[in-house]
């Protein structure tokens, strides 16, 4: 099944709107968590070729799914008393229900940008960003022993004291 072509800006707009309405009743950590992840989404929009930006946005969306479940389950009974409380809680729940679908769409965008599945042992290692930078050394032997050529030419090898 082919995923629909959805712009990242639409995903951000929908989640921003639902988070704003959810903040009518859920404030503090709910707002900080969700708006921080939306800021990562803005970064992913601004840098269209960045694998790190879209990857961090995807990871943040997954994290906020769990955080929203915990936050809504703890505070729902105390805030959903009036009409405004029920509306805000409903929008937060709707945002939570849309996040797995958004994660699928963002993961598809992550793959289009050249990203890989982030479940591998060296995930926290060097970045996957590709640049035009090339090293000066063409051989790996020169990097392993930089003074090997000096000994072969009869020159004195510098010593560290």
From Swiss-Prot:
GO terms for biological process: regulation of blood pressure; response to hypoxia. Interacts with RACK1, and with the C-terminal region of AGTR1. It holds the Pfam family AGTRAP. The gene is Agtrap. GO terms for cellular component: cell cortex; cytoplasmic vesicle membrane; endoplasmic reticulum membrane; Golgi membrane; plasma membrane. The chain crosses the membrane at residues 27-47, 54-74, 87-107. The keyword Flavoprotein does not apply. Appears to be a negative regulator of type-1 angiotensin II receptor-mediated signaling by regulating receptor internalization as well as mechanism of receptor desensitization such as phosphorylation. Also induces a decrease in angiotensin II-stimulated transcriptional activity. May play a role of negative regulator in cardiomyocyte hypertrophy induced by angiotensin II through an inhibition of p38 mitogen-activated protein kinase pathway. Residues 110-122 are annotated as: Interaction with AGTR1. This is Type-1 angiotensin II receptor-associated protein. Residues 48-53, 108-161 are cytoplasmic. It is found in: Endoplasmic reticulum membrane; Golgi apparatus membrane; Cytoplasmic vesicle membrane. The modification Phosphoserine is found at residues 127, 138. The keyword Amino-acid biosynthesis does not apply. Residues 1-26, 75-86 are extracellular. Keywords: Cytoplasmic vesicle, Endoplasmic reticulum, Golgi apparatus, Membrane, Phosphoprotein, Transmembrane, Transmembrane helix. It is a multi-pass membrane protein. Disulfide bonds: none annotated. Ubiquitous but more abundant in kidney, testis and heart. Its main location: endoplasmic reticulum. GO terms for molecular function: angiotensin type II receptor activity.
